[in-house]
Amino acid sequence: MNIEGFKVNFLGDSITEGVGVTDRKNARYDNRIKNLFNLSAVNNYGIGGTRLAHQTHASEKPRHDLCFCGRVYNMDTTADMVVVYGGVNDYLHGDAPFGKIGDKTPATFCGGIYFLMNYLKENYKDKPIIFMTPARCHYGTIDCFFTSNHKNKIADAKPLIAYVEAIEETGKLFGIPTLNLYDKLGLDPHDPETKERYTVDGLHFNDAGHEFIANALKGFIESL
């Protein structure tokens, strides 16, 4: 797919916001994509700590409750393409139930994905939409191979791979291509050398990590 000259919306969390990079204008993955494809503009809608689904109880940091499903209405509908990259905060500290594929309410994680994809398909008709899943993380005492140990998590919480698979499966329902960064990014912060070289803390990527993400997204776009 050729997207030269496109204006692209990027909806995401702290990684899309640029936490971890030294120069957001040049090092952040969305701006790298802008340069790689000679885009006309990128609109960055990244807010750290935010989740796809609604939070059941108010967070200690109100900013974290600005969920994707609420913010999607504020995006520029004249954009030529939309990229959504999120889900890791739902895994890390979201208290919404996981739910099941086919849920339509943003009160569950699975329902939040459905809600977002449905809204985007209706409001960006015939425009490319791409979702990116969370990559692997090893953040403090939280290991993506296991359920998050954050105090907010409820009984039906799952390891990160379940959140990844829910995004992929819902993408298939809507015909929305999904880039699986969990499997295909090729970076695993469980390896100490990889963690130091590409992340600042096992979750947020540094400049080199954002270059990795941009190249993965570039290849994915070109394959469509």
Q: Model-found features: residue ranges?
A:
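Alpha-helical cap/lid subdomain in secreted, periplasmic
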Residues: L66-L224
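Conserved SGNH/GDSL esterase-like catalytic core that processes O-acyl groups on lipids
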Residues: N2, K7-N9, I15-A107, G111
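Short hydrophobic segments within beta-strands
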Residues: L11-G12, M132
